[in-house]
From Swiss-Prot:
GO terms for molecular function: ATP binding; insulin receptor activity; insulin receptor substrate binding; phosphatidylinositol 3-kinase binding; transmembrane receptor protein tyrosine kinase activity. It comes from Rattus norvegicus (Rat). Expressed preferentially in the kidney. Also found in stomach and thymus but not in skeletal muscle, brain, intestine, and uterus. Its main location: membrane. Glycans are attached at residues 47, 311, 411, 492, 528, 616, 634, 756, 885, 898. The chain crosses the membrane at residues 922-942. This is Insulin receptor-related protein. Its EC number is 2.7.10.1.
């Protein structure tokens, strides 16, 4: 077998491997990644060679194809668990994204699947040319309406058992142009043919990338040249028979080598690599968790197997003698479910405290005993509260000691509160439980007899430590209802997912006797709830409860917010006061409200379920679905939208005369023949649904697996997606359907399927039931149909998100007929051209034509003509025909099949004696006429150009707007056609600021993300020139810590200034987003001291550079520092900060806006701005970093700040401010300017604490700084002069002078 035939894609793969460098030497391991919402999140994969865990890429609804252009992660070679892709819009192939992904190991699977590609609306091919192995698990590719090249993949080459794969609901193979390289005249050598699923075909991932088929024995991998790799290699290699040159390892990886077993002194970890004992000892299953890994039988494990434990400081697992002692460090652990006890299995010594809060469940004791039954010692306290599911505490059958190292409220070692069904303390009395310190507390345990508590006092040795009130006889063991006072609700407010309540203040005789309130609530479709708070008839807890602390003010009414609740659901609620009676002779006191019923507000429903469709004619589609799982109101109608989809134009590329043509169909969905779901009775509320299957009859295994997967996947979606309210309101649907359809398409992103789909109108209808008939459709055309559920509150909450289905109408039997007659024209001696018109409205696309022609007295010949061949001449050229009389007829073949034959046309071929001289006569006539026309056009063009160039530009004030004010394009000029605008970033003082892409701006980069500053359309020529001159100041700056100017577009409108894009915005916004209570918190921790010093160093470095360039900033503040994607802080802005933070400025004496809270005293007094005054501002920026961007001098007005600073005041010290930063601030705020340090001196003090990367890119470590370091003099600006650094901000100077 020839190597070139095996490897037509070898050059591509070779380049990919070269881009990896030494495959295993540079391994970078990343943990599991969940990448969603934004395409930029994919950058987290940038340095990953292996994803140790799973990789999920999902829910990118706003993405477009352009967002993925140039995005590639060639370093990624393997994923150890599974790869999941779900609803990523705009992504057409994984070919460029993961060109070298070679192995999916499947160590942990997603419900049995290692590769899941689900509902990817724009994916056209999988395109993983390097993928060579899916070691474990099946493949699920489902509901991807544009996905092709599935029939050309031999999954048997990738998987040991491909029979479990689930590949359904994708684009029909008959509609796909699944042509492999080298087939039907395609470029390259043909791919290898294999047999899979009984079908022999060429194997490829795309039309330009073959599937890898190695000519090696025993399934070995191979190089791009077909040479066999080492037996330990998997997925390919760069050198044959070299275990160091593998793309991935078949068994184990260690220090760049693939090995069958781990070397001595190393241990297997995560089934694919070897680690040292030292590294294993540092691993944690949960980062930051105390429990360390252990080594057992050559493997590094998260915990030792049963019967084994770690002894002391040893990392190795040893067999226990008898019962394994197991120490578990838990801190203070709350157990609110059986699952929460699973990490205590086998624990005998609990170092910490346990809080049991088991409110729901039935017959939990066996499972709790299995998980907690070995516990002998608790070093802290044991608190059992609100555990309505507990009847006994016997599951602590071995508990012998509660040591009391920490106690509840500093007093109680055992605390048992409000356990409505607790009856027994188990074997504690018999086992001799000891409580050496602290008290015990029992209250509100109505079924727990007092004698059990008194016995426990004796055994534990706590008798006499606690008062009678701490074991209250009236709240323990008292089944009878106590005499209580009625509480009255005074306020309630309902929302979609919450209820706000307030009730009257209850005051017992002794105010200190009132401890708290408990609010009980539950769903109650009928107003028949009782106050019983134990398990219901089904054994589950009926009431939810919430502790409410007493208000601090005695006049304030207590209240609570119940959340999260279900929309449009009736809840029963009552409140009970928890009291403690200290006086022995005092009557029992208590208070409780009656049960009230409240209904939450409606919300948008969830999506309709199980939508199906079929076609019963060429112009109709039938659609049916089931109601949403959560209606969140009364469903009043369904909004149905449908749009015609464009046919795949790529089908024209193939020559269907040479390729077997399998045509798409519009088969009837048999599910329509089943019973109408509308006729099935819904279960009555409050009753259990009946089982349709006979008792004991289970679903078939395959169907059960399918149901399980669908339920689990839908649960995953339910928890993973928060569907926002629809941005449109249903009440406006009938006002202007066309406008509303456009709005749907623009705002909700619906129906963005093909390149030309926007040319087709979106239709809509409202239907009252779960079915719709769509009429007036085009024959044999695919439609996307979206269904939204709308309830009675749709006018305020909107309808649900859409569920969608794709369906094709049936063909029209006459649509593929060729209109008119076939005509012919003789060309040459033995050739004719047959012309005919295409069917004006065919069934889908016309793929080919068939011409049946015959010479009189001979057999007919059938000629196939592809659509491309027809398009060249509008017919077919029949050549080399012998003389004689002929007849011919034509028929078209569309996606729906063959059309009807045309009527025959007769033509003849003349003999050799007849020659056509007409062509020469025509040529002699046309040539002179054409020459005269060319001369006339040239003359017109000359006069028009001369007139255009004579236009004069005048100035009303030529003395003021002189030549010196004109902007002259230079080497910074960028052609406008290289710029693409993506989205708005904000409004600057000159005009709008956009995010964009610039092509060819940087060497080696196809496109560069940039920020584009513009001038308003109504700006004068002077304003445009001033805008460009301000930007020109930045041309002199080239420092890593100053935002760079990248180019200028001065020719044409609008004028653009191209700046470096700082994706995380200004430092002030970034710091505020890191506050714990911030709504836009990105999930990042608050900055540590090292992070703060790094920010300070980067700002100081940028300011040192400006000082060396003799520039004074005059407005240094966090709002004027920008943060890049990698969190680097730079000096500069996008001209937006004054608009966003205008309150940070103050107008003094009718002049311009001044940033008084950041200004030095000499600047406030005399208007003097120097590098020393910038240092003062730097100190304020440090204060902003420490406080996460609080406003300086909070509580003082701008006038008060002016007086305070000029009188010698400085910002107050923060309690939690690091001493190092506080000292730096004090030095920056010296009132004598020359006593303040320079920026270089500041860097001298903190250089040792900056990250190593700072040395590589900073001005401070550059030769330019070292030369000028000793001679840096403060740069001064005269009072009220224009700002020296015009380019640093896009608004006017602080003193209000326009600068000219």
């Amino acid at each position: 077998m020839a190597v070139p035939a095996l490897w037509p894609w070898g050059v591509y793969l070779l380049m990919s491997l070269l881009s990896l460098g030494s495959c295993l030497d540079t391994l970078e391991v990343c943990p599991s990644l969940d990448i969603r919402s934004e395409v930029t999140e994919l950058r987290r994969l940038e340095n990953c060679s292996v994803v140790e865990g799973h990789l999920q890429i999902l829910l990118m609804f706003a993405a477009t194809g352009e967002d993925f252009r140039g995005l590639s992660f060639p370093r990624l070679t393997q994923v150890t668990d599974y790869l999941l892709l779900f609803r990523v819009y705009g992504l057409e192939s994984l070919r460029d994204l993961f060109p070298n992904l070679a192995v999916i190991r499947g160590a942990r699977l997603f419900l049995g699947y290692a590769l899941i590609i689900f509902e990817m609306p724009h994916l056209r091919d999988i395109g993983l040319p390097s993928l060579g192995a899916v070691l474990r698990g099946a493949v699920r590719v489902e509901k991807n309406q544009e996905l092709c090249h599935l029939s050309t993949i031999d999954w048997g080459l990738l998987q040991p058992a491909p029979g479990a794969n689930h590949i359904v609901g994708n684009k029909l193979g008959e509609e796909c142009a699944d042509v492999c390289p080298g087939v039907l005249g395609a470029a390259g050598e043909p791919c290898v043919r294999t047999t899979f699923g009984g079908h022999t075909d060429y194997r490829c991932w795309t039309s330009s990338h073959c599937q890898r088929v190695c000519p090696c024995p025993r399934g070995l991998a191979c190089t791009v040249g077909g040479e066999c790799c080492h037996s330990e290699c998997l997925g390919g290699c760069s050198q044959p028979e070299d275990p160091r040159a593998c793309v991935a390892c078949r068994h184990l990886y260690f220090q760049g080598v693939c090995l069958p077993t781990c070397p001595p002194g190393t241990y297997q970890y995560e089934s694919w690599r070897c680690v040292t004992a030292e590294l294993c000892g540092h691993l944690r299953e949960v980062p930051g968790h105390a429990t360390a890994f252990g080594i057992y039988e050559g493997s590094c494990l998260a915990q030792c197997p049963p019967g084994f434990t770690r002894n002391g400081s040893s990392i190795f697992c040893h067999k226990c003698e008898g019962l394994c002692p197991k120490e578990c460090k838990v801190g203070t652990k709350t157990i609110d479910s059986v699952q929460a006890t699973q990490d205590l299995v086998g624990c005998t010594h609990v170092e910490g405290s346990l809080i049991l809060n088991l409110r729901q469940g039935y017959n939990l004791e066996p499972e709790l005993q299995r998980n907690l039954g070995l516990v002998e010692t608790i070093t802290g306290f044991l608190k059992i509260k609100h555990s309505f599911a507990l009847v006994t505490l016997g599951f602590f059958k071995n508990l012998k000691l509660i040591r009391g190292d920490s106690m509840v409220d500093g007093n109680y070692t055992l605390y048992v509160l409000d356990n409505q069904n607790l009856q027994q303390l188990g074997s504690w009395v018999a086992a001799g439980l000891t409580i050496p310190v602290g008290k015990i507390y029992f209250a509100f345990n109505p079924r727990l007899c007092l004698e059990h508590i008194y016995q426990l006092e004796e055994v534990t040795g706590t008798r006499g430590r606690q008062s009678k009130a701490e074991i209250n006889p009236r709240t323990n063991g008292d089944r009878a209802a106590c005499q209580t006072r009625t509480l009255r609700f005074v306020f309630n407010l309902t929302e979609e997912d919450r209820i706000l309540l307030r009730w009257e203040r209850y005051e017992p005789l002794e105010a200190r006797d009132l401890l708290s309130f408990i609010v009980y609530y539950k769903e109650s479709p009928f107003q028949n709830a009782t106050e019983h708070v134990g398990p219901d008839a089904c054994g589950t807890q009926s009431w939810n409860l919430l502790d409410v602390e007493l208000p601090l003010s005695r006049t304030q009414e207590p209240g609570v917010t119940l959340a999260p609740l279900k929309p449009w659901t009736q809840y029963a609620v009552f409140v009970r006061a928890i009291t403690l009676t200290t006086a022995e002779d005092s009557p029992h006191q208590g208070a409780q409200s009656p049960i009230v019923y409240l209904r939450t507000l409606p919300a948008a429903p969830t999506v309709p379920q199980d939508v199906i469709s079929t076609s019963n004619s060429s112009s109709h589609l039938l659609v049916r679905w089931k109601p949403p799982v959560q209606r969140n109101g009364n469903i009043t109608y369904y909004l149905v939208l449908w749009q015609r989809l464009a046919e795949d134009g790529d089908l024209y590329i193939n020559d269907y005369c040479h390729r077997g043509l399998r045509l798409p169909t519009s088969s009837h969905d048999t599910r329509f023949d089943r019973e109408d779901p509308a006729l099935e009775a819904e279960p009555e509320q409050g009753c259990c649904p009946c089982q349709h299957s006979p008792p004991g009859q289970a679903l078939p295994a395959l169907e059960a697996q399918e149901v399980t997967f669908q339920k689990k996947f839908e649960n995953f979606l339910h928890h993973a997606i928060t569907i926002p309210k629809a941005p449109w309101k249903v009440t406006s649907i009938n006002k202007n359907p066309q406008r509303d359809s456009e709005r749907h398409r623009r705002e909700t992103g619906l129906l963005r399927l093909g390149k030309n789909n926007s040319d087709f109108e979106i239709h809509e209808d409202k239907v009252p039931r779960e079915r719709a008939v769509l009429s007036g459709l085009r024959h044999f055309t695919e439609y996307r149909i979206d269904i939204h559920a709308c309830n009675h509150a749709a006018h305020t909450v909107g309808c649900s998100a859409a569920t969608f289905v794709f369906a094709r109408t049936m063909p029209h039997r006459e649509a593929d007929g060729i209109p008119g007659k076939v005509v012919w024209k003789a060309v040459g001696k033995s050739s004719v051209i047959l012309h005919w018109l295409e069917p004006p409205d065919p069934n889908g696309l016309i793929l080919k034509y068939e011409i049946k022609y015959r010479r009189l007295g001979e057999e007919a010949t059938v000629l196939c003509v592809s659509r491309l061949r027809y398009a060249k001449v509008g017919g077919v050229h029949l050549a080399l025909l012998p003389p004689g009389n002929y007849s011919a007829k034509v028929r078209a073949t569309s996606l729906a099949g063959n059309g009807s034959w045309t009527d025959g046309v007769a033509f003849y071929i003349t003999g050799p004696e007849e020659e056509d001289t007409g062509g020469l006569r025509i040529l002699l006539t046309v040539t002179p006429v054409g020459f005269m026309l060319l001369v006339m056009l040239a003359a017109l063009g000359f006069f028009y150009s001369k007139k255009r160039n004579s236009t004069l530009y005048t100035s009303v004030n030529p003395e003021y707007f002189s030549a010196s004010h004109m902007y002259v394009p230079d080497e910074w000029e960028v052609p406008r056609e290289q710029i693409a605008i993506i989205r708005e970033l904000g409004q600057g003082s000159f005009g709008m600021v956009y995010e964009g892409l610039a092509r060819g701006l940087e060497a080696g980069e196809e496109s560069t993300p940039v920020a584009l500053k513009t001038v308003n359309e109504l700006a004068s020529a002077r304003e445009r020139v001033e805008f460009l001159k301000e930007a020109s100041v930045m041309k002199a700056f080239k420092c890593h810590h100053v935002v760079r100017l990248l180019g200028v577009v001065s020719q044409g409108q609008p004028t653009l200034v191209i700046m470096e894009l700082m994706t995380r915005g200004d430092l002030k916004s970034h710091l505020r987003s890191l506050r714990p209570e911030a709504e836009n918190n990105p999930g990042l921790p608050q900055p540590a001291l090292s992070d703060m010093i790094q920010m300070a160093g980067e700002i100081a470095d940028g300011m040192a550079y400006l000082a060396a360039k003799k520039f004074v900033h005059r407005d240094l503040a966090a709002r004027n520092c920008m943060v890049s994607q990698d969190f680097t802080v730079k000096i500069g802005d996008f001209g937006m900060t004054r608009d966003v933070y205008e309150t940070d400025y103050y107008r003094k004496g009718g002049k311009g806006l001044l940033p008084v809270r950041w200004m030095a005293p000499e600047s406030l007094k005399d208007g003097i701005f120097t590098t020393h005054s910038d240092v003062w501002s730097f100190g304020v920026v440090l204060w902003e970093i420490v406080t996460l961007a609080e406003q300086p001098y909070q509580g003082l007005s701008n006038e008060q700040v002016l007086k305070f600073v000029m009188d010698g005041g400085v910002l107050e010290e923060q309690e939690d401010c690091p001493i190092q930063l506080q000292e730096l601030m004090r030095r920056c705020w010296q009132h004598t300017p020359r006593l303040r340090p320079t920026f270089v001196h500041i860097l001298d003090r903190i250089q040792d604490e900056l990250r190593p990367s700072f040395r590589l890119c900073s001005f401070y470590y550059s030769p330019e700084c070292q030369r000028g370091q000793a001679s840096l003099l403060p740069t001064e600006a005269e009072p009220d002069s224009p700002p020296t650094l015009n380019g640093a901000s896009d608004y006017g100077p602080p003193n209000g002078d326009p600068g000219h």
